[in-house]
């Protein structure tokens, strides 16, 4: 649980879920977004104008930039994270700046996502997987692990995967090359691990998002592709982490962690705007981006007793540094048709102010972000630790500089500090049942006042607002009976945003997300496993500029999200398991005035797997049919704050794979 470390689920004043590598493999998940479709608190969207996976948790975005890797921000590939090297996907629900530090990408208000890499198990592992999809996409993956040395203390795990071919979207081709190496050493009082990974991801003719005009268009056929044939998205990422722990005594442990990432992205896109009657308007947008990121964290964690009161204390310091280089070019608009796409020759670059910025061949520095923080907390235990009270505070600094795309001159700068506290209480009613409550905050960088708004000058132009402080209160109950478990939570999160009042740029806007969240998991009957839940959300704009749209619902936040997945080990056929999953998302508003909305949708996924032994080798055959009914639907609107682009749901997709353990 962030800097609090490994905690019993029942003893924390928060809710979270971990999705394991077994689930990832059994569901043939290709990326983090495939995994998170199991979570009723999460809906998957897309970044603005690109193909970045974006996750909406409790109605607030978590950008893929803000996913942490082994507890450190900013290290994973920025647009798409392959699933083959992942041991666990951990979803934390709720604000979390005290626990994890401020998310550098500006997300994390509604939750956090942490990825844990695979480690070598005690037994040798040599696993090969072959797979294919009905569109023509093929894949091969290898997972090899060994432990060596005295008492098998040194471990090595290698994961490699390759995918290539056309997807179930017409004329859309994807290719992926992924490599990850994990090393670890387990000493008596010393533990160390290191991970390095590389990922290349390319999409040719990727189906773009659609921005609605005055109406929401009917969803095209889910297999249709309205991309231009010259569009593509390409990224190459290299990343690594290092973590060490040392037990100074039975009561005190120290840790040190560090990581880095170097990334390159190139995109040539043309995302259409719907103008009615099937007609669209689009412009070429080409960009090149390079990222250099390093991050680190160190801390101490321990426990002691004062009379009848136990203490679990922690203190830590963290730093994150990112340099972004970027360049872009655009074209004049060209016409198209959403339902009868026509290929258009690649248009020339436009000229004039803001039509381009920087050199696409050599992108210049446009942004430098640095965050640093100090945190301290104590969890006090009363009544033989049946009552736990957590108190803590993090001193968070956020510094950001932006630079002109063409001249390289500094355009703006920002440096602010904020204290962000936490208070949490857990009471164990029984060994199986606990109740909890918390107050915690989320922190994101404040905006810089523009020179003008709506043609009128802004009085405090250039002023940097203090970090936006989102306040959350939550209460709930948890149950873990061994075979089944779950949680019920009620929460309210207030998130400020910028407005202009009497010509002054302020943080006077506010969005309040209130909700009820039910999640469950377990095996209620022998051979029958369930995973799912429901989230009810009211995302209200409680304070807006001049009261416009006040009281309306936020863009892209459904009032109801429900997931239920099940597995059934078929009696009489050892090794055969049938699976199913139903996802429901209610309608979503696509404009702040709530005049436009996309319809609700329900998706059915079906699957089966069969485990057998052939010549002393474990073999598993898997089949999965996503969107089994072949529904055409808009899956999401928006995701990036203030935008309302539409993303078409994926078509019916049949995935087959075979895994052999040698």
Where do the model's predicted regions map?
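Membrane-embedded beta-barrel scaffold of Gram-negative outer-membrane proteins
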Residues: 243-247, 251-259, 263-271, 436, ...
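Outer-membrane beta-barrel translocator/receptor signature
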Residues: 84-87, 97-179, 185-191, 238, ...
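Conserved C-terminal beta-signal and adjacent last beta-strands/turns
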Residues: 312-313, 437, 473, 555-662
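Acidic, small-polar-rich N-terminal luminal/periplasmic segments of exported/outer-membrane proteins
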Residues: 1-123, 475
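Gram-negative outer-membrane beta-barrel transporters
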Residues: 485, 490-494, 507-592, 659
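Face-selective signature of the C-terminal outer-membrane beta-barrel domain
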Residues: 240-263, 283-404
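Acidic/polar loop-and-plug regions of large Gram-negative outer-membrane beta-barrel proteins
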Residues: 163-167, 180-247, 260-291, 334-363, ...
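Surface-exposed extracellular loop regions of Gram-negative outer-membrane beta-barrel proteins
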Residues: 202-215, 321-326, 426-474, 479, ...
């Amino acid at each position: 649980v962030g800097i609090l470390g490994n905690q019993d689920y029942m003893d924390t004043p928060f809710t979270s879920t971990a999705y394991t590598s077994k689930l990832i493999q059994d569901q043939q998940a290709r990326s983090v977004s495939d995994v998170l479709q199991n979570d009723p608190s999460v809906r998957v969207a897309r970044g603005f104008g690109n193909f970045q996976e974006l996750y909406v948790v409790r109605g607030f975005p978590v950008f893929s930039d803000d996913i942490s890797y082994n507890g450190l921000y900013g290290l994973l590939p920025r647009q798409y994270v392959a699933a083959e090297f992942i041991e666990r996907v951990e979803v934390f629900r709720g604000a979390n700046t005290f626990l994890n530090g401020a998310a550098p990408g500006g997300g994390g208000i509604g939750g956090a996502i942490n990825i844990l890499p695979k480690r070598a198990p005690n037994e040798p592992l040599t696993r090969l997987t072959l797979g294919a999809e009905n569109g023509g996409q093929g894949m091969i993956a290898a997972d090899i692990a060994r432990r060596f040395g005295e008492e098998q203390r040194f471990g090595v795990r290698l994961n490699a995967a390759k995918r290539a071919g056309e997807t179930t979207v017409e004329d859309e081709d994807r290719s992926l090359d992924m490599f990850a190496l994990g090393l670890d050493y387990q000493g008596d009082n010393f533990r160390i691990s290191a991970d390095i990974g590389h990922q290349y991801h390319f999409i040719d003719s990727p189906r773009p998002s659609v921005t609605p005009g005055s109406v929401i268009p009917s969803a095209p056929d889910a297999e249709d592709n309205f991309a231009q044939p010259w569009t593509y998205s390409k990224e190459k990422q290299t990343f690594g982490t290092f973590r060490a722990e040392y037990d100074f005594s039975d009561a005190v442990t120290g840790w040190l962690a560090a990581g880095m990432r170097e990334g390159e992205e190139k995109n040539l896109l043309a995302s259409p705007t719907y103008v009615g009657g099937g007609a669209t308007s689009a412009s070429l947008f080409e960009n090149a981006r390079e990222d250099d990121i390093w991050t680190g964290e160190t801390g101490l964690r321990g426990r002691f007793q004062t009379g009848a009161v136990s203490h679990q204390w922690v203190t830590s310091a963290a730093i994150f540094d990112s340099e972004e280089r970027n360049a872009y070019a655009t074209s004049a608009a060209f016409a198209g048709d959403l339902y009868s796409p026509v290929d258009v020759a690649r248009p020339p670059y436009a000229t004039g102010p803001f039509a381009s910025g920087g050199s696409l061949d050599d992108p210049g520095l446009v942004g430098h972000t640095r965050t640093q923080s100090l945190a301290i907390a104590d969890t006090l235990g009363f009544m033989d630790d049946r009552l736990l009270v957590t108190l803590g505070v993090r001193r968070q600094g956020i510094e950001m500089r932006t630079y002109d795309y063409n001249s390289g001159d500094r355009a703006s700068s920002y440096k602010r500090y904020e204290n962000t506290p936490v208070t949490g209480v857990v009471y164990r009613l029984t060994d199986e049942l606990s109740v909890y409550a918390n107050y915690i905050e989320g922190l994101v960088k404040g905006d810089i006042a523009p020179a003008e708004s709506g043609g009128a000058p802004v009085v405090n132009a250039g002023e940097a607002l203090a970090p936006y402080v989102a306040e959350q209160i939550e209460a709930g109950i948890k149950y873990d009976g061994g075979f089944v478990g779950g949680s019920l939570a009620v929460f309210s999160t207030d998130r400020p945003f910028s407005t202009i009042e009497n010509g002054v740029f302020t943080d006077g806007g506010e969005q309040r997300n209130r909700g009820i969240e039910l999640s469950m998991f377990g095996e209620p009957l022998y051979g029958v496993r369930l995973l799912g839940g429901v989230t009810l959300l009211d995302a209200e704009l409680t304070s807006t500029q001049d009261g416009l749209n006040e009281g309306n619902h936020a863009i892209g936040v459904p009032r109801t999200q429900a997931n239920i997945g099940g597995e059934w080990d078929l009696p009489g056929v050892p090794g055969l398991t049938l699976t199913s999953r139903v996802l429901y998302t209610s309608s979503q508003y696509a404009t702040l005035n709530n005049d436009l909305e996309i319809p609700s949708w329900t998706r059915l996924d079906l699957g089966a797997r069969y485990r057998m032994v052939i010549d002393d080798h474990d073999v598993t055959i898997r089949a999965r049919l996503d969107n089994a009914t072949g529904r055409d639907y808009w899956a999401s609107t928006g995701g990036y704050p203030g935008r309302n682009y539409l993303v078409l749901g994926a078509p019916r997709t049949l995935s087959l794979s075979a895994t052999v353990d040698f």
